[in-house]
Amino acid sequence: MSLNTTPAAERTHIGIFGKRNAGKSSLINAITSQELAIVSEQKGTTTDPVYKAMELLPLGPVMIIDTPGLDDEGKLGAQRIAKAQQVLNKCDIALLVVDASVGLSEADKALWQQLQAKKLPSILVLNKVELLDEMRQALLTMEAMKLTKQCFLVSAITNRNINELKEAIAALRPREVERQLLGDLIKPCDIVVLVTPIDSAAPKGRLILPQQQVLRNVLDNKGIAVTVQESELAEALARLAFPPKLVVTDSQAFGAVSKIVPPTVPLTSFSILMARYKGTLSSAVEAVRVLDTVQDGDKILISEGCTHHRQCQDIGTVKLPGWIRSFTKAEPEFCFSSGTEFPEDLSQYKLVVHCGGCMLNEREMQSRSERAAAQNVPMTNYGIAIAYMHGILKRSVAPLPDIAKLLE
């Protein structure tokens, strides 16, 4: 991610779905007024979901996702369809594209019903209408209106109704829920200390995304941000004329930082703030006590929303399993997932421990949490789990009164 661009997780995600050769890629090019997607008469040109970050007026920053055809064939086709289905879990808006010259198929109607079942804001787009005479257009419109009034006859070739479609997409933009990282916890000129370890896993020349976002949120709310490594924390606190309003640490440094920061100073972590921002913190706190019941052989899934090169002291694959073994005095079986890969079937797991989800948009993070809940599998968070195992969970959520009540 460039430091000058909106993070992917903060963009409105628009998924483009439909059968092969429905005109999904040509529609994307028409909507964006750019040749972003490869267009071909050959079926199956798009073999994997393709993500395109851009500005789309009047929406603003968006992530457009071009998906493989949902009627793909063969073993590889089934895998491509599964990838397209995964995209449904992260979309804020879905466009179902139908080749108007072919008409609505039963598969199209089934997918539309699936979109409605997910309560996903959707538009039915009847593309290639330049191939139909007025009578056939009228008949197709009547059939489509039986499914939804939110349908458009468009032509990606002539740009017919493309502007109207863009306006309709903008009107479907999800109403933003006012969630804060920490802006509601501080006042102007409050001091916030950010503890950001620089170790072998840290990216070269920049802070990781949660640290960037929290730092920006402090500045946006007129706070005073002091950023240090764990090794300089004690000296930084000693030099401050006033105690900080809040200390935010990387979760993996929770144990050491909690010993340095006076008990009178509120302390939390980037991961906890990120889970709060994504709306999954309450369920993560309620789930963490499952660690008390872990036994030998229990399966624990540790899941990250991004993919990165694993280091020898990687938090997900090395440190967390080590802390869990030490805390539980047991030998559970650890499984791992990263990026877009998150199991559909979670029933085999005693517990899911998920990262803060900075690289996932709110809808996908909520989808993962809801999937776990539907299968009665507790899902907690890196920061919550680490704080709990270090005996400082109450302290780490004390700055968040609504969450702190869950531990009373």
Features from the language model and the residues they span:
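Helical mechanochemical/support elements of P-loop NTPase systems and associated helical scaffolds
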Residues: Q42, T46, V50, R80-K90, ...
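Canonical P-loop GTPase G-domain recognition
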Residues: L120-I123, K128-D184, I191-V193, K222-S231, ...
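G-domain G4 guanine-recognition motif of GTPases
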Residues: T67, V98-S101, L120-R136, F152-R160, ...
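Conserved C-terminal guanine-recognition region of P-loop GTPase G domains, centered on the G4
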Residues: K52-G60, Q79-C151, L181-D184, L207-G223, ...
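Short, flexible loop segments at the rims of nucleotide/cofactor-binding pockets, characterized by
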Residues: E41, D71-L76, D99-G103, A171-R173, ...
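Conserved G1/Walker A P-loop phosphate-binding module
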Residues: M1-A78, Q86
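C-terminal effector/interaction modules appended to NTPase cores
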Residues: M1-S2, R11, K19-S25, K204-E408
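Long, well-ordered amphipathic alpha-helical subdomains in the mid-to-C-terminal portions
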Residues: L185-Q213
